[in-house]
């Protein structure tokens, strides 16, 4: 089995590839090769039971993905994107990478022909939904994004559905919750503070909170995000039907509930490292995001996430900090 990971140098891509290296198989099929594409070289896991190839390329340019698709990978995991804040700040770059990149990928698959029909897992986002919201967004809620990033992902979902309907590939779109707690340094995502206010205090560093304590959002851990990819790659897609884009399960919490969970897990000294510095730009972006979901379809189809924000924090401590933190 040959797996192509687009955006393989990013956090979720790295963790997905590490999971593949650990398991050595996917859905009961042995993995022969993993190709990790990105604009920078992806690092190989410490030990891989398969051939690993890191390819540096730009799928947002015409023909930028053709050579990779010519290899006819069995599974394509499309993670390549720029994040929400950057897509909002740079309109042209956002559409070039988040939309043109997906369109070039889908067309490259279509043009191979000869019965080639890979599984394509496309990572979308809950940013495809826009206000006004219900208290809980049901699976039937319409997509009216209020950011450029959300619009780019919504268009990608439509393309995925149509190319799947036409038989060019077997696509599954997964709308990721905000992935929290993200390891590493802060990125340009408008949602980055959700992770920052947990990660930095646990590392003994101060974190900036730019929004109100009452902001509510939908979260899942990096561990769950990898689990979503694994399940989307291996599931029986006949059970999905024609509605190929699914809202992933997660846990809804206010910022205040996040902080209280951190207090329960790590103590008051850690919580005191959070500093409130309001940012109206971030606040405005987040105000247009959904807060809570009733993700019935994905749960019925076997997708799983954490059941509390305390669990999300403990996953981060276990997976990234070796079970310890700075008290």
Go through each PLM region and give its residues.
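Mid/C-terminal beta-alpha module of Rossmann-like enzyme folds, strongest
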Residues: 201, 224, 228-286, 325-327
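NAD(P)-dependent short-chain dehydrogenase/reductase
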Residues: 161-217, 222-227
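Amphipathic terminal alpha-helices
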Residues: 290-300, 307-327
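Active-site Tyr-X1-5-Lys
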Residues: 131, 146-172
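NAD(P)H-binding glycine-rich loop region in Rossmannoid oxidoreductase-like domains
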Residues: 59-97
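Conserved Rossmann-fold NAD(P)-dependent oxidoreductase catalytic core, especially the SDR/UDP-sugar
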Residues: 103-147
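Conserved C-terminal active-site "lid" loop/helix of NAD(P)H-dependent oxidoreductases
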Residues: 43, 222, 279-303
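N-terminal Rossmann NAD(P)H-binding glycine-rich loop of SDR-like oxidoreductase domains
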Residues: 1-26
